[in-house]
Amino acid sequence: MPQHELRTRQLRGLAHRLGLEFQAEDTYDLPAQLADFRLFRKGSRHRASNIMRKQDELISFDARIFDYRYVKWAGNHVKRYQQTVFFLQSTQLGLPELWLRPETIMHKIGELFGRRDIDFVRFPKFSGQYRLTGEDEIFIRHHFTDEVLNYFTIEKGWSLEGIGYYLILYKKNRLFSPRDIEYFYKKGIEVFRMLADK
């Protein structure tokens, strides 16, 4: 059995065990629906698959985990990216537009040329590990409570984007194995609960 078919089969079984809906193929063109997020504007040939979904009865909570692939061209060469994405829509969220990602040496060099991010004096480890950007700094600081900052200080390597009632969480170019999907789902729910309006 080809590897992608085996993955689909394993994820279908996992979704059933967790009480999640499962759809092997994306019939709704998720990447186009999520194009407000930066991740889904990168590259070309965007494709979502193996979509697992959980909704509450009032549809005030809609969470999905899916495989996402796209390609980027560099001259005559193509680089393929794939990652597992957690997407959540909820009226309990009211997020400013924000982008959190691991900070690299290129980001630090960029700061020398005025490309600043949002740092937290009381959480230097967080500020050293992550680059947090967005237009409304005051509103972003309101949502990044001590609980959130502590969480991401311990949890390294995540990328998070938020816009209004929507958020996505992923690790760049990391396709979670079927045995790690439940862990990833729980991480997504934890982040949602921390960022939700109290």
Where are these regions (language model features)?
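Charged, low-complexity intrinsically disordered regions
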Residues: 8-198
